[in-house]
Amino acid sequence: MNYILETLNLSKKSGNTYRVKELSMQVPVGSVYGFLGPNGAGKSTTLKMILGLIHPDSGEIKVFNQKLNSSNKLSILGQTGSLIENPGGYGHLTGLENMQIIQKLKGVNEDEIERSLKTVRLFEQRDKKLKNYSLGMKQRLGIARALLGCPKLLILDEPTNGLDPAGIHEIRELISSLPKERGITVIISSHLLSEVEQMADYVGIINKGKMLYQGTLAELETKGEGLEDAFLKLTGGKESL
């Protein structure tokens, strides 16, 4: 199997406490990979290490079959889109103007703006000021910005946080469509099992910085377990279901 992302024994400490400990993950090309765990399990820390926002204490990261290092980080991350934490943006500017800022920073063709806005179904609202967008629309605009430059890999950290059911549905439909329509592999971190179950092909379950399970949803079913049962058994507690 071909993997677009692999980590090997990735670790990060905060003081004497491991935030991530010897974590190894493999994300297949063309998949939606659900990265699951309770709040504080180490999901965001792992994704920030993959994106070069913080440095691991030990272990290695391979993206596009290349070991991530200081000499190739910019070229590799240039093919990676991400939305970590809040989507941000300038409320007094339109959706289009917010996109143009990122387009110029990335140095990509302006045609990419239209394509990305159409992918997230915001093209018709491009001239509306960002402050008048719903939270779901702001999340979709954040994903549109991440899609500029045609990334091979898209990393989304809790993209449905704070959304109402309609907004969650919009994001779920969008994420599910990206591998087929754009050829993009998606990693989505979440603690909402029911949402990930409707989007993901593969899942990794993490708790206290350690990877506890990694594989397909189908493999869990062959063991007589659903995602919820496996999650509760592995993490030892009830989460958002």
Which ranges hold each PLM region?
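Conserved ABC transporter NBD signature motif
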Residues: 59-70, 75-76
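Conserved ABC ATPase "signature" region
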Residues: 100, 104, 110-126
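Catalytic Walker B motif of ABC-type/P-loop ATPase nucleotide-binding domains
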Residues: 154-158
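Helical segment within the ABC ATPase nucleotide-binding domain
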Residues: 169-182
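Helix-to-loop junction immediately C-terminal to a conserved catalytic motif
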Residues: 51
